[in-house]
Amino acid sequence: MINLKLLLVLTPVIFSVAFTDYWLRRWGVFVWDNGPTIQNQQVWEDTAIVADKGRPSDGYPVFTVRTLAVNALGIPSVFFLGAIFAMQFIRRGVINA
């Protein structure tokens, strides 16, 4: 039972790390040329929201404190809400919970 509890606690952390790593690689922030490097600037040319005037020449930062907050707080919160939702379907006697 302890292994199941440990898995339930670590699953949101593993998903957070995996999804953060995936998107930062896809955006080009994590680059593996000769070694792992971090390029924390991205030029978003294809968006209509960003104005042409006043834009930094090397782009905007991708990996910020907000990125950490969304991934570190948002993803485990979804798992927590899912667990609460799943508890509504556990009946005593059917599943030994």
Curated annotation (Swiss-Prot):
The chain crosses the membrane at residues 4-24, 70-90. Keywords: Membrane, Transmembrane, Transmembrane helix. It is found in: Membrane. It comes from the Bacteria. GO terms for cellular component: photosystem II reaction center. It is a multi-pass membrane protein. One of its GO terms (molecular function) is heme binding. GO terms for biological process: photosynthetic electron transport chain. Signal peptide: none annotated. InterPro entries: PSII_cyt_b559_bsu, PSII_cyt_b559_N. Its main location: membrane. Belongs to the PsbE/PsbF family. Unknown. Resembles PsbF, one of the subunits of the photosystem II reaction center. However, it encodes asparagine rather than histidine at the site PsbF uses to bind heme. This is PsbF-like protein. The lineage of its organism: Bacteria, Bacillati, Cyanobacteriota, Cyanophyceae, Synechococcales.
